[in-house]
A protein has these predicted regions:
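An N-terminal RHG(E/S)-centered segment typical of histidine phosphatases
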Residues: 1-46, 54-55, 62, 70, ...
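Generic beta-sheet signal
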Residues: 3, 151-162
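Phosphate-coordination/substrate-recognition cap region in phosphate-metabolizing enzymes
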Residues: 37-112, 182, 197
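Glycine-rich phosphate-binding loop signature in dinucleotide/nucleotide-binding domains
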Residues: 43-45, 145-154
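Short beta-strand scaffold positions
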Residues: 51-52, 136, 157-159
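Short glycine/proline- and acidic residue-enriched helix-loop micro-motifs
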Residues: 102-133
Length: 211
């Protein structure tokens, strides 16, 4: 199995999602980075593409798929790939948009696009998600990947820096996920060799700059 990991491009109000002010749209920079990422990946042949069920994560995915020469791949949305504290964030966003006395004209679209599979916001905890809980999500994702998909598959994961770092740490057999945190629209690539994973590249951002 070969696994390529990347992250979505920068999204609007990226620095204050915990306040419920974030939008599901990519920023201009995020769109540009996603387009350059798509150009870098256009010749790749993927069997499966996994992404989070947030709107902006799916936007980067759609831009990548649109640019692929070989489009015979399956896109799978997976809540395990959400960013840390995502449910708390989206609950606050929904409350802010619903209770606002002057609703934003795009409120309904934003709410419906926060989740691709469902527009139902799940019950959330009032406390921050722990690193152990994020680790469990990463382990659950990898367990499903290894047990439900062919070992000969080439897989693209469009996650976020935190969840990707936990996934990479698991592949590398490391307990220190912080050393594997990556940049938006970067590329990290791993190939299975027997019982271990060979790192082919990590946090590569060369494709984001004009050559």
């Amino acid at each position: 199995m070969r696994i390529i990991l990347t992250c979505n491009g920068e999204y609007i109000n990226a620095h204050c999602p915990s306040l419920g002010h974030c939008n599901d749209r990519l920023s201009e920079k995020g769109i540009l980075s996603s387009l350059r990422l798509a150009k870098e990946l256009k010749n790749q042949i993927f069997d499966y593409i996994f992404c989070s069920d947030f709107g902006y994560r799916r936007t980067t995915t759609d831009l990548i798929v649109e640019g692929l020469i070989y489009k015979n791949c399956k896109i799978i949305v997976d809540a395990n790939l959400r960013e840390k504290d995502a449910e708390i964030c989206t609950q606050k966003i929904k409350e802010n948009l619903t209770q606002s006395s002057d609703p934003h004209p795009e409120s309904s679209q934003i709410i419906s696009r926060l989740f691709i599979k469902s527009d139902i916001v799940p019950t959330t905890k009032n406390t921050s998600e722990s690193s152990e809980q994020v680790l469990i999500r990463a382990q659950n994702f990898l367990h499903q990947l290894f047990h439900n998909y062919p070992s000969s598959s080439t897989v693209l994961i469009i996650g976020n820096p935190i969840i990707n770092s936990f996934i990479i740490a698991q592949l590398r057999g490391s307990s220190n996920f912080t050393q594997y945190i990556t940049s938006p629209c970067s590329l990290s690539e791993y190939e299975q060799k027997g019982n271990s994973w060979q790192q082919l590249r990590f946090n590569d951002i060369s494709h984001l700059y004009l050559k």
